[in-house]
């Protein structure tokens, strides 16, 4: 049942029209620090790809390549816990611009 609830949350979050723009979401921050790492990585990747799709679709292949090379968890803090990070900057963060 717990996995079903998380799957539903991920599905809804992945389909959201706009990902969060602020780098701080108290609930997501707390969840991402305690949840299963695989689930967190899946959510981080979905959120990053939603930002790419909305802001810089031409970067989709490059961002996917970088995310697949590993280290998805390194974006956890800036996406969900950093009050000073604007999530629009995540693409530059991922591809090293």
From Swiss-Prot:
One of its GO terms (biological process) is superinfection exclusion. The keyword RNA-binding does not apply. It comes from the Viruses. It is found in: Host periplasm. Transmembrane segments: none annotated. InterPro entries: SPACKLE_T4. Inhibits viral DNA ejection into the host cytoplasm, thereby conferring the infected host bacteria with immunity against secondary phage infection. Achieves superinfection exclusion by localizing to the periplasm and inhibiting the activity of tail-associated lysozyme, thereby preventing penetration by the tail tube of incoming phages. This is Protein spackle.
């Amino acid at each position: 049942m717990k996995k079903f609830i998380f799957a539903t949350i991920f599905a809804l979050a992945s389909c959201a029209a706009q990902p969060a723009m602020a780098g701080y979401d108290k609930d997501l921050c707390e969840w991402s620090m305690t949840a299963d790492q695989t689930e967190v990585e899946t959510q981080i990747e979905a959120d990053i790809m939603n930002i790419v799709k909305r802001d810089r679709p031409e970067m989709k292949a490059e961002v996917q390549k970088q995310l697949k090379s590993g280290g998805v968890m390194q974006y956890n803090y800036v996406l969900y816990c950093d009050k000073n990070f604007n999530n629009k900057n995540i693409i530059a963060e991922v591809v090293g611009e």
